[in-house]
């Protein structure tokens, strides 16, 4: 996206193919920046940004393509062009229908912890016990995903390093990442 965390991501298709050549197994593509402070992007704009990238990658490689979106319309369009994984920074909270779509298609789903919306998520980075809070949130989202028909082996949890957390919270989560939802 034009306002991504990482300037290098703006190369899209060519960068993805270079990373695959260098051994990447999964390429994550997003049409809406979810960095702290980012502005909302419409589903139509997300689709316009990501579909050419997906098409070019899929034409050249069988590497898994993950799509970073919170919108059902976007993942539908992406899967129809060959995307394999839903990476939802809202952990299936922002769009009620996205979980049913993922279950129906049998695609893996990444559920990420964050606080609030990207535009303001860094405004509240204090936690009583960051590990317990993030773990409890992710466990509740896993339960929700299961209740919507997503298979247990298709669910991946992401503690959301850098999303609504300060340095110390990030350090604690990285140190204990293997214990999440355990």
Predicted segments with their positions:
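Catalytic beta/alpha-barrel core
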Residues: 63-70, 75, 84-95, 131-137
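Alpha/beta enzyme core
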Residues: 10-29, 59-60, 64, 76-85, ...
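Glycine-rich anion/phosphate-binding loops
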Residues: 2-20, 45-48, 91-96, 132-138, ...
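Non-cysteine beta-strand/loop elements that form the S-adenosyl-L-methionine
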Residues: 25-31, 87, 107-116, 159
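Alpha-helix-loop-beta-strand connector modules within alpha/beta enzyme cores
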Residues: 39-67, 73-76, 103-114, 136, ...
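Glycine-rich, proline-tolerant flexible connector loops at the mouths of alpha/beta enzymes
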Residues: 2-6, 25-52, 161-167
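Active-site mouth loops of central-metabolism enzymes
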Residues: 1-14, 39, 64-66, 122-132
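Catalytic alpha/beta core domains of metabolic enzymes, predominantly
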Residues: 124-182
């Amino acid at each position: 996206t034009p306002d991504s965390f990482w300037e290098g991501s703006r190369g899209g298709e060519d960068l993805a193919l270079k990373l695959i050549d260098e051994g990447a197994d999964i390429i994550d593509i997003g049409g809406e920046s979810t960095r702290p402070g980012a502005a909302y992007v419409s589903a139509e704009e997300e689709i316009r940004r990501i579909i050419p990238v997906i098409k070019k990658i899929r034409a050249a490689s069988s590497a898994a393509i993950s799509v970073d979106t919170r919108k059902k319309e976007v993942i539908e369009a992406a899967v129809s062009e060959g995307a394999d994984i839903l990476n939802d920074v809202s952990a299936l909270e922002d769009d009620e229908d996205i979980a049913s779509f993922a279950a129906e298609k049998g695609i893996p789903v990444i559920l990420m912890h964050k606080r609030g919306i990207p535009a303001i998520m860094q405004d509240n980075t204090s936690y009583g016990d960051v590990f317990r809070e993030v773990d409890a949130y992710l466990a509740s989202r896993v339960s929700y995903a299961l209740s919507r028909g997503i298979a247990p082996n298709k669910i991946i949890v992401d503690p959301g390093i850098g999303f609504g957390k300060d340095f110390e919270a990030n350090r604690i989560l990285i140190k204990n990442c293997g214990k999440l939802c355990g």
